């Protein structure tokens, strides 16, 4: 099983989806421009309602800026980065279609194509700020995909991340 993650702290903390890591005992982590494969043996923190988890590797990393905004804007251009079907760091683009409330979680609906393995990847604005964490896509719909909004990421991982306003 493969998935994606986002570095949120320079001490090696990585944000991903709980459904990516919840059945694992160890997690192999790759970084761009680094041939070494790192292993994480522990889920540091998780939230089952938000489908978020944090793991840690022993590597200094440059974190991605987390953008906290009032609301993502419909029609706003976005970029999705993940590892669909194991294809490392694949980039696709699209727009924000809507912001949806699903019980306890507010999700961003977006059109950038994703596939299995994209979960845990970054949904970025055009300035490289994290708008959300890619979480789901519907096979029956075309480019009908969801990401956990950055405001929930901030609440969940507040003591791990650097916030950009």
Where do the language-model regions lie?
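Catalytic nucleophile loop of clan PA
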Residues: 6-7, 96, 113-134
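Conserved active-site neighborhood of the chymotrypsin/trypsin-like protease fold
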Residues: 2, 9-82, 86-89, 104-107, ...
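C-terminal cap/linker of serine protease catalytic domains
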Residues: 62-63, 84, 130-165
